[in-house]
Design a protein with these regions (language model features):
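Residue(s) in the substrate-gating loop at a strand-loop-helix junction
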Residues: 144
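Substrate-binding pocket helix/loop in short-chain dehydrogenase/reductase
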Residues: 99-101, 105-113, 203
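Active-site helix of classical SDR
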Residues: 124, 160, 168
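Canonical Rossmann dinucleotide-binding motif of NAD(H)/NADP(H)-dependent dehydrogenases/reductases
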Residues: 5-36
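Active-site loop immediately N-terminal to the catalytic Tyr-X3-Lys motif
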Residues: 101-102, 149-155, 177-178
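Short, flexible catalytic-loop segment of classical short-chain dehydrogenase/reductase
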Residues: 182, 186-197, 201
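Alpha-helical segment proximal to the catalytic Tyr-Lys
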Residues: 129, 173-177
């Protein structure tokens, strides 16, 4: 039987205050890990203040993952708590605009790729030195089925998720010699506020 204990493991989760990130954090905590999460949503972070493990096993910080300076500041805070981490879960991602490619605004395309791809770069770059200190490190990138199959009327989102798959495969080859595994998870539709907005936007085109 596979040992699912995460006792004494140190895990970083970006965009960890809601949705997939929060659900992942709860599972990690339940299995004994110490979790360092960040999010741009201060209201969601405030809700975590009531968590029984807050400031013991759960450390939550405000951070704009699309801003490299903010990410560096977040890691500086983590390093004050621990000198190594065992896993990084890159969960940042926005839905981006809905519409046919020829009607998209360049700024919306660029913003989607900036947030969804560059955030992974910022976090991974900072995490690798800490992961190398672990005997069995892991990077988990949250991509999407859109990164495998495409997604009509959501080309910026699909492009960003395909990019994550490419980076994942490349880093798996680069970091294997350091005993760092790199994998991507590709969820389908997840119930939540973001999906409600996507459905509402897409309904305008049907």
């Amino acid at each position: 039987m596979v040992n699912q204990s995460l006792k004494n493991k140190k895990i970083i989760i970006s965009a960890g205050a809601s949705g997939i990130g929060l659900a992942t954090a709860k599972v990690c905590l339940a299995r004994g890990a110490t979790v360092y999460l960040c999010d741009i949503d201060s209201k969601s972070l405030n809700k975590l203040n009531k968590h029984p493990l807050k400031n013991k096993k759960l450390f939550a910080y405000l951070c704009d993952a699309s801003n490299e300076y903010h990410v560096s500041d977040f890691f500086n805070k983590v390093i004050k708590k621990t000198k190594k981490i065992d896993a990084l879960i890159n969960n940042v991602g926005i839905a981006g605009p809905t519409g046919s490619l020829e009607k998209l605004k360049s700024k919306d395309w660029e913003n989607t790729l900036h947030v969804d791809v560059n955030s992974h770069f910022y976090f991974t770059k900072k995490a690798i030195p800490l992961l190398k200190k672990s005997k069995n490190g892991s990077i988990i990138n949250i991509s999407s089925t859109a990164g495998i199959l495409g997604f009509p009327l959501r080309s910026p989102y699909a492009a960003s998720k395909w990019a994550i798959i490419g980076v994942t495969k490349t880093l798996a080859m680069e970091l294997g010699k350091f005993n760092i595994r790199v994998n991507a998870v590709c969820p389908g539709t997840i119930k939540g506020d973001r999906m409600k907005r996507v459905i509402k936007d897409k309904a305008k085109f049907t």
